[in-house]
């Protein structure tokens, strides 16, 4: 059962809504400290996602839930026409299996964030997502709605759902109606943009 605020946002069919019943945190300093101390790191090639939670038995693997649950992007190839070929995973991952906080985030403010989220919502993956300067995501739909918390953002960073365009303010919780709604995000600035993104399950 969805928490009341999320159910309200879904019913209203709004693409973006601020969530006001979760505590706000200044995560940028803690996140940078974890990076600087090599506790966590970005993926060597994509530099796109770090997972806060994982599945049982993968407690130290903050890349386990990175990317698509269905498609194996890490083993994609490019054919002679320049078309990217991506295979399905042998065993697809499932959002509901991500129930364990990665060990690297224990005893940090990110554990407080995770506990606050799990006290209100049934979660799938919770990830820190980096959108690099002058980059745009593919136009796609998710099979869950998401709650976003911008850790670092600036002018020129926007999310688009259907035809609605929104800049998501830093250190503010946002519900995004991405379940079966086409959407993308783009970073027109000259700096990285980091969001904490939680999949909300019903």
Predicted regions, residues:
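Non-heme Fe(II)/2-oxoglutarate
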Residues: 2-113
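Conserved short histidine dyad/triad with adjacent acidic residue
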Residues: 127-142
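A generic structural motif
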Residues: 134, 144, 154-156, 180, ...
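A short hydrophobic beta-strand segment most commonly corresponding to one strand
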Residues: 147-150, 190-202
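A short beta-strand-loop-beta hairpin characteristic of the jelly-roll/cupin
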Residues: 150-169
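Conserved metal-binding segment of the jelly-roll/cupin
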Residues: 167-182
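Asparagine-centered strand-capping/turn motif at beta-strand->loop junctions
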Residues: 185-188
